[in-house]
Design a protein with these regions (language model features):
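Soluble catalytic domains of enzymes that build or remodel membrane lipids, polysaccharides, and related
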Residues: 1-211
Length: 211
């Protein structure tokens, strides 16, 4: 499967139009799934009224559906392979002040501590520390949001990004007990059309069943 953890656009849904053909070509055996990021809500645009803002968000959802993607808005799906199953959970953005927390994990998957292997799509990695590791047994969480602030320095095992001033978990794989978080640095840019060291990233993750 292919998953996308939000921020498909920066300000308005119209930004997606030139890329519809390319993104529609993404296919996977178990489907393409997405969630909304903070930029997808239109919170950074001075809309004429609330209706205009909501209409733009609706347009984004329609376009993603036309591309063959399934957006998970505080909901979940089960994926099967033989006798194995995985619960894929998608929540809306876990906002930081002054923006609201649209995400509702308990609504997306009420039985958060059952035995099913669970993958969570949550745009903001702060969500992992604030709710996921303390109140659930979700095995793997996938996030984005930080972009490593588009600046990363690395020398051997040492690395630095200004993103770590705000986000303790800003890039790569993290573990707490038996729970894992992967933060992808993304492929685009926000406001500044540049990346220094923080090269565009597409992550490939292989899950193996251990009997």
């Amino acid at each position: 499967m292919i998953v996308f953890t939000g921020d498909l656009v920066t300000l308005r849904s119209a930004e997606l139009e030139p890329f519809l053909h390319v993104l529609s070509g993404l296919k996977a055996k178990n489907g393409v799934y997405s969630i909304l990021g903070n930029h997808d809500y239109g919170d950074y645009v001075p809309w004429k009224n609330v209706s205009e803002k909501l209409e733009d968000r609706k347009h984004l959802r329609i376009r993603e559906k036309e591309m063959g993607w399934r957006m998970l808005n505080n909901e979940s799906v089960y994926l099967y392979s033989g006798n194995d199953s995985v619960a894929l959970i998608g929540v809306e953005n876990w906002g930081e002040p002054p923006f609201p927390k649209y995400g509702n994990l308990s609504a997306a998957y009420p039985d958060l501590n059952d035995d099913c292997f669970k993958i969570l799509l949550t745009h903001n990695p702060m969500h992992w520390d604030e709710e996921v590791i303390s109140g659930t047994n979700i095995d793997l969480s996938l996030s984005g949001h930080t972009h490593a602030m588009q600046i990363k320095l690395q020398l051997g095992n040492w690395r630095y990004s200004p993103a770590e001033i705000r986000y303790p978990r800003w890039s790569g794989l993290y573990r707490e007990g038996n729970q894992y978080l992967y933060v992808n640095e993304g492929i685009g840019c926000v406001f500044m059309p540049m990346r220094v060291g923080a090269t565009p990233e597409i992550t490939v993750i292989r899950l193996k069943c251990i009997s």
